[in-house]
Every structure is written in C-alpha cells, then in structure tokens.
C-alpha cells in the first residue's frame, strides 16, 4: 500500500498536502534541495511519456534493416529519458516496450574521457556482466557497448566504459541526468530488457531526439540501400576499378589508408585478377543519429577469386554525398 521509491514518496506527500491547500509545483516546498529538483525532473520525464502518445504505425528511422539473427533492437532517446525496445518481426521492426532511463550528467554527444556525456550513434552490445562480476552500484547487471566505434575514433572521440546497467540495491531509479555517460535503468526494467539482448548482435542506437517514420518510408529506404550495396558488390565482381571505386568517398578511410592509397591498392590488385566472386549475407543496415544520410552496414562477406579466398565480418559506414 506504500510507495517503494523516492519519487513515489514525494508524490504521496503532495497528495496529502493537497488536502490542506493547493499545490504550486511537484514536491511543493520552498527552498527545494537538489534531491527535490532531481525528483521533479524525473517526474516530468515520466509524465511526458504518458502525455505524449507513442507514434501510431511509425518506427524510429534508424531501423532500416535487421539481419536475420538479430531478434531485437534498442533505441535510446536521451532527450526524453526513454529507451525503446523493438522486435525483428520477419524484417519489420515491431514495438515491444519502453522504459525510463538516466543518461549523462552533462547531456549527450560524448567527445572525450570524463566529459560526463552519453554518446550518440550506432553501437552494439559487446558483453553481458552478471551481478556477481560488478559492484552493487551497477545493479543487477551490465551490458557494455562498443563506444568508441569506428566512426567515433575517426572523429577523434575517446573514452571507454559506456554500459547499459542497473542501479544500486538501495535505489529504485536515478534522475534523468545523473550518470557519467552510461544508460541506466531501474533494476526490474534492466532484468526485463536483459532477456532480449544478444551479445555481439543487438544494436543500441542512441539519439538525443529520435525521429519517427512510417513503414512505407522505411521500406523505400531499405530498398534503396539494398540496391546501393548490391551495385557495389556487382561492380567489385566486374574487376572494373573505375566502377568499383566510384562508390568510395574522397574522404574514405580504413585502418592505415586514405582514398588515394586505397585507389592505388585496388587498381594494383585488380590487375592480377581474372575473376572475382563476392557473396554477402546476414546484412543489417542502421541509420546513424545526428549524421543525415549515413548508414552503418554490417554483413558476412565470402570472397573468392583466381588467387585468393577469404571470409570475414565487415562493417561499413555509407553516406549519400551526391
């Protein structure tokens, strides 16, 4: 019958106080402490979720294409202190649930170690840390993500230790802006989410303002991107260096290479080829928050030619330039 967490106690106190006189604010009191301010912020964030209905028949624009084995995707909106869970329903993203979250004290778009910000981008769960392997501060479990990713490092961003995790055992939830950059959930919510997270597979897409689109728009974008990747694959098989290299930006980079060195290398390699076959499978495509027209494309690649065979997991960052 009684509340079990701090915000609920604050609301209960307001309800009792309202019997005596009208309230002027949440946590009606003069000279509010920092804790009261934090609780008010949490109340506003939670109330906003119920006042603003979920977009009907719309999904985050980032969920362009799941790979077949990717069962779920996580989308975080730091601006609304909300985490959304979507299921891969035969390639179509279906809303499952959403949860209140805490993010970085200094806001979003992490740049460097210790800036107290939550990163924005497309990330993937890299590990599952049970309660027995972490301190009580992190709650019932933790799921590290791959910040900084390849794009972050290219932008000169650094830092480490960005996790999805819970809260201490004596706490139910934390204020909207209270972490050092991690995404923090109440322990019951983390436990619910944990069942659907796949290490190495589940994308965690973090935005400061999630954009929603209808299914038709998303399907059209999926078709366009699939065709662009297929054109790239086919032009690679053609051994026509000009056709192949037209897919690459002049600002292209790979470990130890820029566009100029990549251009020279591919022309030299193609000169020794009489045939090339490239098969792509298990491909996912996710839009990158804050970078219009940029997509993270991940796939299994099976390459064979007259003088080389290899298989690898490849991740590329595609961007429409012209």
Segments predicted by a language model, with ranges:
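Surface-exposed, charged secondary-structure patches
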Residues: 265-315
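Exported/periplasmic cell-wall-interacting domains
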Residues: 129-230
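Gly/Pro-biased beta-strand-loop elements
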Residues: 51-163, 168-173
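Short, well-ordered alpha-helical segments enriched in acidic and aromatic residues
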Residues: 238-255
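Alpha-helical linker/edge segments of TPR/alpha-solenoid repeat scaffolds
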Residues: 16-59, 275-278
């Amino acid at each position: 019958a009684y509340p079990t967490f701090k915000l609920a106690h604050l609301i209960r106190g307001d309800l009792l106080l309202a019997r005596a006189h009208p309230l002027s604010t949440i946590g009606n009191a003069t000279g509010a402490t920092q804790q009261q301010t934090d609780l008010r912020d949490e109340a506003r964030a939670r109330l906003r979720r119920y006042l603003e209905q979920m977009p009907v028949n719309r999904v985050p624009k980032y969920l362009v294409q799941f790979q077949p084995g990717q069962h779920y995707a996580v989308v975080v909106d730091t601006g609304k202190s909300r985490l959304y869970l979507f299921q891969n329903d035969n390639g179509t993203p279906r809303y499952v649930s959403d949860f209140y979250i805490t993010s970085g004290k200094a806001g979003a778009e992490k740049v460097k170690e210790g800036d107290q910000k939550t990163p924005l981008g497309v990330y993937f769960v890299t590990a599952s840390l049970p309660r027995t392997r972490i301190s009580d501060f992190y709650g019932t479990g933790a799921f590290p993500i791959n910040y900084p990713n390849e794009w972050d490092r290219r932008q000169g961003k650094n830092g480490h230790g960005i996790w999805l995790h819970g809260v201490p055992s004596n706490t139910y939830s934390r204020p909207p802006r209270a972490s050092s950059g991690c995404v923090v959930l109440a322990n019951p919510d983390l436990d619910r989410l944990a069942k659907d997270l796949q290490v190495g597979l589940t994308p965690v897409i973090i935005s400061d303002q999630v954009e929603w689109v209808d299914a038709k728009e998303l399907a059209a974008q999926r078709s366009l991107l699939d065709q662009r990747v297929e054109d790239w694959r086919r032009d690679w098989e053609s051994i026509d260096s000009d056709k192949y290299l037209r897919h690459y930006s002049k600002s292209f980079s790979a470990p130890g290479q820029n566009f100029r060195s990549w251009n020279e290398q591919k022309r030299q390699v193609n000169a020794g080829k009489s045939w090339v076959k490239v098969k792509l499978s298990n491909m996912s495509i996710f839009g990158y928050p804050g970078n219009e027209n940029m997509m993270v494309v991940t796939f299994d690649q099976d390459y064979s030619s007259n003088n080389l065979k290899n298989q690898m997991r490849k991740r590329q960052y595609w961007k429409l330039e012209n």
